A protein has these predicted regions:
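Surface-exposed ligand/attachment interfaces on beta-rich extracellular proteins
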Residues: 48-61, 110-117
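Amphipathic alpha-helical segments that form the core helices of the histone-fold
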Residues: 24-39, 150
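Internal mixed-charge
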Residues: 1-6, 79-180
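Hydrophobic beta-strand residues in large extracellular and virion-surface proteins
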Residues: 28, 50, 67-70, 82, ...
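Solvent-exposed beta-hairpin/edge-strand motifs
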Residues: 58-75
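Short, intrinsically disordered N-terminal pre-domain segments
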Residues: 1-26, 30, 173-180
Length: 180
């Protein structure tokens, strides 16, 4: 779904004739960042390798939102003995660490771009933009519609979260009928 399609959805949902492009882009970027922070499955995961010395603070990448997992020296086991503060990380032992983290998406700058979050969250993104536009427009005083849009937005976020977690499962249990 492109930003233009999101704008068309918002205009149709609210019954407006026009919405300034700068607000569409601003709202899409704000909600996209919010969804990536609130829901791991909405954002993109990236890895970063650090060679660290014990007790030394090392800068995390500038696009890092949150560290999800850390592995030491190409181990398959999760390493948890580290501290994160103010965009820096400190380890209690020397070594090479691979950090898996959530990264900020690239912000959209044009109406023909597709937002960089998981496609499952695009409906929630559209409803969030509709809610923000209804709140921004001072002449739109229908609080019932605003609250309904907010409920739809939060419901769409939760639905997308459950759909994303269901799609991650590689195997599903199949019930077999009794043999006899």
């Amino acid at each position: 779904m492109t930003v233009q399609e999101i704008k068309d959805f918002v205009l149709n949902k609210l019954g407006f004739k026009e919405m300034p492009d700068k607000y569409v882009l601003q709202f899409v970027n704000e909600i996209m960042d919010s969804l990536a922070i609130d829901y791991d499955s909405a954002g993109k995961k990236t890895t970063y390798t650090i060679t660290a010395t014990k007790g030394t603070w090392t800068d995390l990448p500038s696009d890092c939102i949150a560290v999800k997992r850390c592995f030491k020296d190409n181990s398959e086991y999760n390493y948890d003995d580290f501290i994160i503060e103010n965009g820096q990380i400190q380890f209690n032992t020397d070594g090479t660490y691979t950090i898996e983290y959530l990264a900020l998406q690239s912000h959209v700058t044009a109406l023909n771009e597709v937002p960089g979050i998981n496609i499952i969250f695009h409906e929630a993104l559209s409803l969030g933009v509709a809610y923000k536009e209804a709140c921004r427009n001072f002449m739109y005083d229908n609080d019932t519609v605003k609250s309904q849009l907010y409920v739809e937005y939060t419901s769409a976020k939760e639905t997308a979260k459950s759909r994303a977690s269901n799609s991650k499962r590689s195997r599903k249990r199949i019930k077999y009928a009794d043999f006899f």
